[in-house]
Amino acid sequence: MTKTAVITGASSGLGLEFVKLFANDGYNLVVIARNEKKLLELKKEFSNISITVIPKDLSMPNASKEIMDEIQTKKISVDVLVNNAGFGLLGSFENLDIEQQLNMIHLNISSLTELTYHLLPELKKSKHGKILNVASTAAFQPGPNMAVYYATKAYVLSFSEALAEELKEDNITVTTLCPGATKTNFSSVAKVENTKMFSNAMSSDVVAQQGYHALMQGKGVVITGGFNKVGALAAKFLPRRTAAKVAKLVMKEN
């Protein structure tokens, strides 16, 4: 029986790369993003599989519940959930627009949590459910000048690791992908493309492949790239104040 994967933020960047990987393995897809035109183009491009298009802004209240309602109405069984949608903002906390920061919290945390909650019953039915939550190396230390973003990714990592333990008996694996700087439209939205951190950004297809393979193997946490692995490890042993200073330095423009 053909399996189905639900992918958020599917119209570009890592989400688009995940669409390609799942499609190439013959998965049917439920693709979610704000840009309906791009989603419909994906449906046309991958005509060999069934793709359900759900144009939805996950930063809006009730979006996750509406997605679940549509999935149930169409009687779609779900085997894999990829929580990829998210964004960041560069700047001091007090100078960034508070509404944008609250939207970030809602998208990066609340929507991810809510969609996972609503889809868990479906994942349990599959007997071999898989969840991939996209966090970041930002999850491992505080991030001055991206304070809220770093905090949201720390939540994603902690939540995912706890959920992985809870769901072991249900044969559901939870994989947390923690990429460092990656070449996607995230950098332009967050306005970090000219920072030291993004001077050696990885390509989105390589990052997605590593995340996909880890997901299929049922791994827990995967950090992409050797440099990022070293940085995440160092952050665990550095005093928190020192780690924050280092994070602040890499946020400076070249």
Regions flagged by a language model, labelled:
Residues 136:
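Residue(s) in the substrate-gating loop at a strand-loop-helix junction
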Residues 92-93, 97-105:
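Substrate-binding pocket helix/loop in short-chain dehydrogenase/reductase
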Residues 166-230, 241:
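SDR active-site lid
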Residues 11-12:
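Conserved glycine-rich cofactor-binding loop
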Residues 116, 152:
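Active-site helix of classical SDR
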Residues 25-41:
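Conserved glycine-rich Rossmann-like NAD(P)H-binding loop of the short-chain dehydrogenase/reductase
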Residues 84-89:
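Conserved NAD(P)H cofactor-binding loop of Rossmann-fold oxidoreductase domains
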